[in-house]
């Protein structure tokens, strides 16, 4: 299924996958895999993504 919430939040912040990756210290491929639902990020990485995108863990990682 993927994580469309991260992609939507990233696009709203006008970040490319590469820009988000650099801000959280991972590769662009990691961000791509998270968005595609093919990678389960660590809690530390989840928190980093939330901080950069100005969202909460619930906003981005809680399933509706």
Question: What are these regions, as identified by a protein language model?
Answer:
Residues 19, 30, 59:
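Residues in the helix-turn-helix
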Residues 4-23:
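Short basic helix-loop element that most often maps to the first helix and adjoining turn
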Residues 26-39:
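Recognition helix of helix-turn-helix/homeodomain-like DNA-binding domains
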Residues 44-59:
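DNA major-groove recognition helix of helix-turn-helix/homeodomain DNA-binding modules
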Residues 1-4, 15, 40, 44:
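Residues at secondary-structure transition points
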């Amino acid at each position: 299924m993927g994580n469309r919430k991260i992609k939507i939040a990233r696009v709203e912040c006008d970040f490319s996958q590469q820009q988000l990756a650099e801000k959280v210290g991972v590769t662009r491929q990691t961000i791509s895999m998270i968005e595609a639902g093919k990678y389960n990020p660590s809690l530390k990485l989840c928190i980093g993504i939330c901080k950069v995108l100005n969202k909460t863990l619930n906003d981005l990682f809680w399933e509706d």
